[in-house]
Amino acid sequence: MAGCGGAISLDGAMSPRKVSPRLSVERLLANATALLCETGPMRPIVQSRKLQHVRYDVRGPILVEAHRLEAEGHKILKLNIGNPAPFGFEAPEAIVADIVHNLPEAQGYSDSQGIYSARTAVAQYYQSHGLTDTAVDDIFIGNGVSELISMVLQAFLDDGNEILVPAPDYPLWTGAITLSGGTPVHYRCDEENGWDPDLADIEAKITEKTKGLVIINPNNPTGAVYSEGTVKGLVEIARRHELVVFSDEIYEKILFDNAVHHHTATHVGADVLCLTFSGLSKAYRVCGYRAGWLMISGPKHPAANFLEGPTLLANMRMCPNVPAQHAIQTALGGYQSINEYIHPGGRFYEQSKTAWRLLNEIPGVSCVEPRGALYCFPRLDPEVYDIKDDEQFVIDLLRAKKILVTHGTGFNWFEPDHFRLVTLPDLDTLTEAIGRIGDFLATQR
């Protein structure tokens, strides 16, 4: 068979009954080639314009470069994702056993909002924390918090609506708002004040298009844990401007040095709608199980039309994965093994403190002490390090020292002078990793 410039010749006098299978295939190929020659090459297939401004740099181009280096045979220490399992953290045995035990009952769809026992366990958890009006129907189970965030924003946003998002943020929020047609407006968190939200900056950025306020507490990437006064101040802004509050609390159980987590929902009263997101991934070390939840509190009657949206979208996705739902009741009602990790002597605690100390020992590097979560977010003094492109900086670090971190602008920070480091490796590995970072920075001064 020839290309477009040639001819394909088959004996036209041949009887169809005598055409061999091979010739039949050749005739089909000839027809396909002729069609291609007539129509030209296939048009490019491009991604939707909706993705034009969507980024998720935690798993973005830098991770692609890390995979390329691994394919060349290099060993990369990945400090870019808060995933406990690869660093030797195992799920509580009771959770795994309960999932295995219930597998025969988990083969079909569940209720679209989640199985009743899981939603009841979540509702009772919040009731025990002072949110006594929480009902089972106020709970949606999801395939992790990420799914629920995207689902709720799709139900809430019209094109051009604005949502206030902290800077730095967990970039899923910015990406999901953009993908849902909204506009993320980033308010500054104050590094000199322990990364607390700048309430005046929030007020200054509210417009007639502003519809909601995102709170991430404990904070990813900074490790800040907000005081009760700060939480009340954020809720009061939402109250004055009739904003819906989206409270991301996935790290609520990972707290250091007697830090206290204050549920945003305990302060909203009857006039602020609050959507709280949490789950099992971090505190129970089961990121891969994808078990998260949404809790709705505040004035539900005025929000009835909006709340039909998440219900519709939950129906369209059929249901959350059923096996992992069986872990929720066991996790929330059982022994809280997370407490072994967050106090002195525990791995989360010791690794966070060690990383913070070692980073601050590097000339030109400063890091606010994390009070929770699994990260450090150090600053590189611009007077010492002339970094114009922090993404290129972390790529250069990766290539030189085989350490993978995430650049600060990947968390929508305003200046190219920070990076995020995961504090999950054991102390020896973490010490070596930060030593390599220090060696690399010595070449940049």
Map each language-model feature to its residues.
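N-terminal small-domain helix-loop-helix segment of the aminotransferase-like
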Residues: 43-144, 151, 331-335, 443-445
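Helix C-cap/helix->beta junction micro-motif
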Residues: 69-72, 180, 240-241, 401, ...
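Conserved PLP-anchoring active-site segment centered on the Schiff-base-forming lysine
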Residues: 155-177
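Active-site phosphate-binding strand-loop segment of PLP-dependent enzymes
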Residues: 185, 190-262
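Conserved glycine-rich beta-strand-loop-beta hairpin in the small C-terminal domain of fold type I
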Residues: 329, 345-355, 367-381, 415
